[in-house]
């Protein structure tokens, strides 16, 4: 983790907007969808890039791992890549709770600013199912994909 350890607790609402800015710095132009139904789970954030869908689960300092196993299973059916974004409370142990192909981003408060650290970049998700992935897209998104690929 980076910077000075701080005992200030970060909540989901404190993390989201700065996270979107951080992801845009890394990936360039992105589209963000929040609270997207993903099978039997609800993805906190779905990041759409020109070539992939990313499922992003936020575990703030106030969260527990209670639902994480089921969330991982569901995310792995739908997304090309997955991230878990964790507060400092979870940073030391999160890798024990997500597969090796999941990316891990830590977040902490440093001198009053939200600071992110890429602990591990995601690898391509081996469990993604194309039919599941397509099922979460809305009609306008599917039409756009068809247009990009010269399909009627």
Question: Where are each of the predicted segments found?
Answer:
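Short N-terminal edge-element motif at the start of the domain
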Residues: 23, 38, 43-44, 52, ...
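Catalytic cores of nucleic-acid endonucleases
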Residues: 63-106
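Acidic-basic catalytic patches of nuclease active cores, encompassing PD-(D/E)XK
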Residues: 2-32
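Positively charged, polar, low-complexity stretches
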Residues: 21, 30-31, 43-48, 104-111, ...
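Conserved catalytic cores of phosphodiester-cleaving nucleases, focusing on short active-site segments
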Residues: 19, 45-47, 52-61
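A conserved mid-domain beta-alpha-beta active-site/ligand-binding segment of alpha/beta enzyme cores
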Residues: 113-152
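Short, solvent-exposed loop/turn elements at beta->coil junctions and helix N-caps
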Residues: 33-38, 92
């Amino acid at each position: 983790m980076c910077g000075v350890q701080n005992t200030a607790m970060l909540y989901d609402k404190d993390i989201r907007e700065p996270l979107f800015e951080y992801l845009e710095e890394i990936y360039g132009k992105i589209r963000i969808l929040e609270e997207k139904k993903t099978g039997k789970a609800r993805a906190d954030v779905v990041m759409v890039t020109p070539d992939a869908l990313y499922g992003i689960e936020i575990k703030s300092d106030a969260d527990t791992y209670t639902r994480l196993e089921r969330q991982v299973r569901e995310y792995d059916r739908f997304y090309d890549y997955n991230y878990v974004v964790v507060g400092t409370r979870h940073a030391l142990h999160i890798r024990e709770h997500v597969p090796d192909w999941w990316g891990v981003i830590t977040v902490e408060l440093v001198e009053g600013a939200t600071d992110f650290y890429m602990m591990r970049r995601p690898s391509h998700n081996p469990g993604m199912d194309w039919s599941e992935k397509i099922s979460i897209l809305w009609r306008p998104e599917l039409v756009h994909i068809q247009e990009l690929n010269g399909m009627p």
